[in-house]
């Protein structure tokens, strides 16, 4: 049975935490991914647990920048430690960049792999799976680049995102099958007319029912995080629409009884 969580990305980096969590819970979700909030903003683990109420912190997400110096890596290590303290199972990373839209240089691929592997080994010591998120306009976009990253790492896992896979002309289901042993969790969102939209409203032809059936068939143990980067209405309205879409396919959003 799949476990669903909802990303906080749509509320921005400095939201009113109790209000945001109430809004997510009221729209039907049991778990969240904490997206790029500073530790200062989140507060102590005890405070965050109070703010979460009945919601579960499923995953956290951050940004890795190149060059990956010790200061930047130290901040990410502290984020991973925090993820472990609040019981998050995975920590997602996105980043690197394609300067002027050129392909990354070999040394950029190598540096990203070294930094991600260091963080992944640190996460493994804390019981947190560190996952790189292949992403348009970042160092790792395509299947070939994913292969390069995975061949250079061992502890690192993936956060596969159906929309970003489709945006580079590749098949999300083929990626799920190929990388199932290295995928700790996934992101689902839709795309239309140059922007991300609610599930089922896109124009890329992403077959979300088929993706969910594939995850079900492989008894996927990780979180399925629904993400909505920006909303034309409000974050809460989009969260409710995404919940309704999954429920229309027969899925339940209850996560508490499904803890791994």
Where are these regions (language model features)?
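Acidic-and-aromatic substrate-binding clefts and catalytic sites of carbohydrate-active enzymes
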Residues: 11-16, 34-46, 64-74, 99-103, ...
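Aromatic/hydrophobic pocket-lining residues that form π-stacking "cages" and hydrophobic walls in ligand
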Residues: 20, 46-48, 79, 119, ...
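Conserved beta-strand positions in the central sheet of alpha/beta enzyme cores
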Residues: 33, 59-61, 92, 131, ...
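Short acidic, glycine/proline-enriched helix-loop-strand junctions
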Residues: 41-59, 104, 128
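Active-site acidic/histidine proton-transfer and metal-coordination neighborhood
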Residues: 67-158, 165-167, 236-237, 255-256
């Amino acid at each position: 049975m799949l476990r669903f969580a909802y990303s906080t990305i749509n509320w921005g980096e400095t939201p009113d935490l109790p209000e945001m969590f109430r809004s997510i819970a009221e729209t039907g979700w049991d778990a969240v991914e904490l997206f790029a909030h500073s530790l200062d903003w989140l507060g102590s683990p005890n405070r965050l647990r109070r703010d979460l109420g009945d919601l579960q912190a499923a995953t956290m997400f951050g940004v890795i920048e190149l060059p990956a110096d010790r200061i930047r890596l130290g901040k990410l290590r502290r984020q991973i430690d925090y993820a472990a303290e609040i019981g998050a199972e995975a920590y997602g990373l996105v980043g690197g960049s394609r300067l002027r839209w050129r392909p990354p240089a070999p040394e950029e691929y190598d540096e990203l792999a070294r930094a991600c592997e260091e963080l992944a080994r640190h996460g493994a010591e804390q019981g947190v799976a560190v996952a790189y998120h292949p992403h348009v306009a970042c160092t790792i976009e395509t299947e070939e680049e994913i292969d390069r990253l995975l061949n250079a790492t061992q502890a690192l896992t993936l956060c596969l995102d159906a929309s970003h896979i489709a945006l580079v002309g590749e098949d999300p289901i083929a990626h799920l099958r190929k990388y199932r042993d290295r995928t700790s969790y996934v992101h689902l969102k839709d795309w239309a007319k140059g922007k991300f939209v609610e599930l089922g409203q896109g124009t890329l032809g992403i077959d979300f029912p088929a993706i969910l059936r594939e995850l079900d068939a492989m008894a996927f143990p990780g979180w399925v995080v629904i993400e909505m980067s920006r909303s034309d209405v409000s974050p809460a309205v989009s969260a409710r629409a995404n919940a309704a879409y999954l429920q229309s396919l027969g899925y339940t959003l209850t996560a508490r009884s499904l803890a791994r």
